[in-house]
């Protein structure tokens, strides 16, 4: 799935302009899975939320396609009411996007696709003052976007993120911001943002100040930490401080996508009942500033269990 004179500077202009170029939501509410009525309760529908100022309506539980190339799981998620799918150019060397693209072909307007591009800035974002390096960065972003569009078999991507941003220099870089503004104007993407696996508190504070980005994707769970299942590294965050910044993001119209949602382990809402991953997701969704989440689901049974948290 982290950057004077009497006139405003170019960067200030970019930040002011960003809020006005977010695409309008394509869809009305996606039909939910309706619970069978009984004599004792009214029917319940799945939870769909608006992704910040983008106006895009997303299922509050989304499918994270970073760990599978099995199209039946994408189809299963669709069949169970999920309309938000997270992928990235880096996953399976682009094959994740190819797989998602094959499944959504013919139903593009019924789904919301979030993808990511990985770019490298060197140490702490330094070394981009050279014009040739900036040109190279621009070309890298353009090439990555075009490859994603081709793989996904679409002419637009709903949300495009910088993958794994960790410094303010990255997210505030003029070349990056100009690229995102231009591609939004051209209709190639509807919204832009970044994902961050570390240093997210600093980046959250920065994005709340600049208000340039439409969407942010950060780790979030009841435990306030995670261990990366593949790389094995550990990360934790100051939950109260992160909560404060996420509330500000909601007020600023910034859509929040949660990741590492199950890395905190199962959860018991009352401390008595057996902890479950469904309740862990429900805990996340109890916070209104979470628009949706990208959850890796390895089976149809996991999909059905996780979807229950949306009721």
Where are these regions (language model features)?
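N-terminal secretory signal peptides and thylakoid transit peptides that target proteins
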Residues: 1-22
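Beta/alpha (TIM)-barrel catalytic core signal, keyed to glycine-rich beta->alpha loops juxtaposed to Asp/Glu
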Residues: 11, 93, 164-311
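C-terminal segment of N-terminal export signals and the immediately downstream linker at the start
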Residues: 29-61
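Conserved, mostly hydrophobic/aromatic
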Residues: 51, 63, 85, 100, ...
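Short, acidic/polar
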Residues: 68-77, 137-151, 199-206, 277-281
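Acidic (Asp/Glu)-rich catalytic clusters
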Residues: 77-79, 101-108, 150-153, 207-211, ...
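Glycine-rich, proline-tolerant flexible connector loops at the mouths of alpha/beta enzymes
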Residues: 86-104, 168
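Active-site groove signature of glycoside hydrolases
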Residues: 150-168
């Amino acid at each position: 799935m982290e950057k004077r004179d009497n006139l405003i500077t170019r960067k200030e202009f970019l930040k002011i302009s960003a809020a006005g170029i977010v695409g309008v939501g394509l869809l009305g509410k996606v039909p939910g899975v309706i619970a069978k009525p009984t004599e004792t309760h009214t029917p319940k529908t799945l939870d769909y939320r608006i992704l910040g100022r983008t106006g895009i309506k997303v299922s509050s539980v989304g499918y994270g396609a970073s760990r599978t190339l099995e199209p039946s799981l994408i189809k299963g998620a669709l069949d169970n009411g999920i309309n938000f799918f997270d992928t990235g150019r880096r996953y399976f060397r682009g094959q994740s996007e190819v797989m998602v693209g094959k499944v959504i072909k013919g139903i593009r307007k019924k789904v919301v696709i979030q993808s990511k591009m990985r770019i490298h800035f060197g140490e702490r974002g330094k070394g981009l003052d050279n014009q040739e390096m900036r040109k190279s960065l621009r070309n890298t972003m353009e090439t990555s976007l075009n490859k994603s569009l081709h793989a996904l078999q679409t002419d637009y991507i709903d949300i495009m993120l910088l993958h794994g941003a960790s410094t303010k220099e990255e997210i505030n870089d003029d070349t990056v911001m100009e690229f995102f503004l231009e591609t939004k104007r051209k209709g190639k993407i509807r919204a832009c943002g970044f994902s961050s696996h570390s240093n997210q508190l600093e980046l959250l504070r920065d994005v709340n100040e600049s208000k340039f980005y439409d969407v942010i994707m950060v780790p979030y769970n009841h435990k306030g930490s995670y261990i990366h299942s593949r790389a094995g590294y550990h990360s934790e965050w100051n939950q109260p401080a992160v909560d404060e910044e996420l509330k500000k993001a909601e007020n600023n119209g910034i859509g929040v996508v949660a990741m590492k949602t199950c890395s905190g382990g199962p959860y018991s809402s009352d401390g008595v009942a057996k902890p479950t991953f469904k309740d862990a997701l429900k805990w996340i969704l109890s916070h209104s500033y979470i628009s949706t989440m990208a959850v890796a689901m390895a089976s149809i049974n996991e999909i059905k269990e996780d979807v229950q948290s949306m009721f």
